[in-house]
């Protein structure tokens, strides 16, 4: 089934019955990228100088579709890798508009504020030249192994559900109940 969003035609295989106007981002993004040839680089800096770099393309006509694609891509990166500083290379005008969107009165102010809270740094979104674009940098971090305090675990499986609780690494509660949610009516 054909659809168009911001002048980019795309195909959607299944339309939801309760919201036929809904257009998932993925088919639109795929169609958009078929028309995109202008390289753009996005760097998201997070703790300890770690930088995630994402290379993509824009159509390069500075239209609402370019802005929407860039905005969605930055939001995806913020929510998937996190960061307090976003640097974009290859589209100065769109980056300025995006900085307003992520500003204190913009539609993505919540995202910027959350990143400031998480990383304890002012959130910035800026345009940079290629010579100033940072290289990707990551570091290994040990995760898990924290046994102090109270923890609870829950697993709702297809045939049973399990609950367990520990205090300072010692199990204080465990329960497993046979449960068949797939065969139960809604």
Where are these regions (language model features)?
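Generic recognition of cysteine residues
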Residues: 10, 89-91, 150
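Low-complexity, highly charged intrinsically disordered N-terminal segments
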Residues: 60-112
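Short glycine-aspartate micro-motif
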Residues: 85-87, 149-155
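Short glycine-rich, Thr/Ser-proximal phosphate-binding strand/loop in the N-terminal lobe
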Residues: 19, 28-32, 38-63, 156-186
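Intrinsically disordered, low-structural-confidence terminal and linker regions
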Residues: 1-26
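Flexible, charged surface loops at secondary-structure boundaries
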Residues: 33-36, 76-83, 145-147
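Non-catalytic propeptide/linker segments at domain boundaries
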Residues: 98-149
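Short, solvent-exposed secondary-structure boundary motifs
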Residues: 22-23, 68-69, 143-144
């Amino acid at each position: 089934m054909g659809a168009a969003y911001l002048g980019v035609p795309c195909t959607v295989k299944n339309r939801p019955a309760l919201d036929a106007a809904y257009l998932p981002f993925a088919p639109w993004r795929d169609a958009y990228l078929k028309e995109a040839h202008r390289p753009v680089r996005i760097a998201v800096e997070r703790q300890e100088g770690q930088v995630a770099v994402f290379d993509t393309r824009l159509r390069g006509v500075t239209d609402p579709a370019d802005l929407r694609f860039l905005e969605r891509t930055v939001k995806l990166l913020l929510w998937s890798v996190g960061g307090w500083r976003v640097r974009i290379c290859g589209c100065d005008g769109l980056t300025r508009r995006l900085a307003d969107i992520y500003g204190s009165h913009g539609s993505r102010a919540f995202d910027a504020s959350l990143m400031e809270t998480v990383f304890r740094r002012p959130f910035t979104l800026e345009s940079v030249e290629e010579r100033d674009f940072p290289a990707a940098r990551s570091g290994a971090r040990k995760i898990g192994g924290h046994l102090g305090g109270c923890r609870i675990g829950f697993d709702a499986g297809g045939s049973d559900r399990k609950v367990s609780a520990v205090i300072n690494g010692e199990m204080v509660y465990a329960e497993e109940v046979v449960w068949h949610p797939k065969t139960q009516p809604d």
